[in-house]
């Protein structure tokens, strides 16, 4: 296991230049002016992430313009100060994934030691982009009712989206504005999470407990999203903060409250358990390392165990048919040798191949009869197990350098009957899936130029 993780990490770093990536952060820009609308150059702009304590700084140019890009999502405190003006603090500025917010800052004349604090969100509308999208917060997704607590079906809350497999955990087949589902791009922390064999869905579905935000972009998106002409579904995972936080969860489903399928003679037994825990916070080792404001972790271990019984309805040969007696068939059987009908519609025992007799005995006897002529039914057990893990590390080297690494392995076990009447014919699928994203951000300013380096996504 350790070797597999190491190989994935090395591969992500070596092939970084070949791997495309989509933006998983946000940005702000704007103008600093005084009460007469005159621009204020050389004003110091500072953003502080409320959850992690990390700060981002810049200064306005000669035209009073400023911008800060590649900011991790979260809630910020924005401050602006300049000589001869009161310090302005904007609290509760929430930045979502792919946001690019314009914030106009107006400073009041006064002493720098004086401070003006503005409570509430400074900007609620994105005026910098014509992108049409819908955003869901991970906390809201946990509270909303959902079958199986799957993430991808939440895409159906966006206008213009339909699916013929709305509850599927991975193969969601979401059709956006009439475009085929194979034209969608599914992203996990900016790295592709796509079934490259046919692009019908995702190799793995993130656990809902790990999701910070889920943005579905359906139109007018920027050039960074270029793999498909449909929608871009961008899932951002949670990271640690300065406070230790976590969850312990268990969700149980069973057939007692389910309705019977109209075409089934009985209610199919089902029991499902989704349980696990998550924990995140600063990396802290007493007397060795204090990672507050610098190094954070987030870990999830989860299990999904489902037991159900599939209902099979089939037509099987009667006991008479198995011995060659087709007198109850209602139409004559003809001898292939002479073209004449068999006497009494009974095939002589000497004419029946013994291998065919052995094969016929493998069929079960009829135990049921419906209007469609089906005469056999049974419930066959099915096992669906999923082991989920998520590991994420964020480290801030400085205000200009930061790195994020996330590794999400998943293992699925499916065991089920494949053929009606033959209980010994079963299929056993063991499917591993892995997704890893690593990115390194370098922000530097020279004549208002900003750069970002993406290290890898796999």
Regions found by a protein language model. Give the residues of each.
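Periplasmic N-terminal accessory/gating domains of Gram-negative outer-membrane beta-barrel systems
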Residues: 85-239, 245, 252-264, 273-284, ...
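Transmembrane beta-barrel strands of outer-membrane/channel proteins
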Residues: 120, 248-254, 299-303, 405-409, ...
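Outer-membrane beta-barrel channels and translocator barrels
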Residues: 181, 211, 238-240, 272, ...
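Membrane-spanning beta-strand positions in outer-membrane beta-barrel proteins
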Residues: 39, 77, 115-117, 185, ...
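Periplasm-facing N-terminal accessory domains of Gram-negative outer-membrane beta-barrel systems
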Residues: 4-10, 14-137, 207-209
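A surface-exposed, glycine/aromatic-enriched loop/edge motif typical of exported proteins
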Residues: 303-362, 456-458
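Membrane-embedded beta-strands of outer-membrane beta-barrel proteins
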Residues: 66, 174, 231, 277, ...
């Amino acid at each position: 296991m350790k070797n597999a993780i190491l190989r994935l990490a090395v591969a992500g770093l070596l092939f970084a230049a070949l791997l495309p990536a989509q933006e998983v952060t946000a940005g702000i820009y704007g103008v600093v002016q005084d009460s007469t609308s005159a621009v204020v150059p050389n004003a110091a702009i500072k953003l502080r992430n409320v959850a992690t304590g990390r700060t981002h700084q810049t200064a306005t140019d000669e035209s009073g313009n400023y911008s800060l890009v590649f900011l991790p999502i979260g809630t910020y405190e924005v401050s602006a100060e300049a000589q001869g003006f009161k310090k302005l603090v904007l609290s509760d500025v929430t930045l979502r994934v792919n946001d690019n917010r314009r914030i106009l800052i107006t400073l009041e004349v006064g002493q720098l030691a004086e401070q003006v604090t503005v409570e509430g969100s400074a900007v609620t509308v994105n005026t910098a982009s014509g992108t049409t999208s819908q955003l869901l917060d991970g906390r809201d997704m946990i509270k909303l009712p959902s079958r199986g607590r799957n993430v991808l079906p939440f895409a159906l809350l966006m206008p213009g989206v339909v699916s013929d497999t709305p509850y599927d955990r991975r193969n969601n087949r979401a059709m956006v504005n009439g475009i085929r589902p194979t034209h969608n791009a599914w992203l996990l922390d900016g790295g592709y999470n796509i079934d490259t064999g046919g692009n019908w869905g995702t190799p793995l579905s993130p656990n809902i407990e790990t999701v910070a935000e889920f943005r579905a972009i359906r139109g007018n998106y920027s050039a960074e999203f270029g793999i498909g002409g449909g929608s871009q579904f961008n899932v951002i995972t949670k990271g640690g903060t300065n406070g230790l936080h976590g969850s312990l969860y268990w969700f149980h489903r069973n057939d007692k409250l389910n309705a019977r399928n109209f075409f089934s003679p009985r209610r199919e037994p089902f029991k499902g358990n989704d349980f696990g825990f998550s924990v995140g916070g600063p990396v802290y080792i007493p007397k060795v390392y204090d990672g507050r404001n610098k190094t954070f972790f987030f870990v999830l271990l989860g299990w999904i165990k489902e037991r159900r019984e599939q209902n099979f309805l089939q037509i099987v040969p009667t006991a008479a048919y198995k011995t060659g007696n087709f007198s109850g068939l209602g139409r004559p059987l003809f001898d292939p040798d002479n073209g004449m009908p068999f006497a009494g519609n009974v095939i002589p025992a000497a004419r029946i191949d013994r291998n065919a007799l052995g094969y016929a005995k493998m069929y079960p006897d009829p135990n049921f009869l419906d209007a469609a002529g089906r005469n056999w039914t049974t419930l066959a057990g099915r096992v669906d197990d999923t082991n989920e893990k998520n590991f994420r590390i964020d480290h801030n080297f400085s205000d200009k350098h930061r790195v994020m690494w996330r590794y999400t392995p998943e293992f699925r076990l499916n065991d089920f009957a494949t053929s009606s009447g033959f209980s010994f014919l079963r299929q056993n699928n063991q499917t591993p899936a892995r997704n890893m994203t690593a990115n390194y951000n370098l922000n530097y300013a020279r004549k208002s130029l900003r750069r970002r380096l993406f290290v890898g996504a796999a």
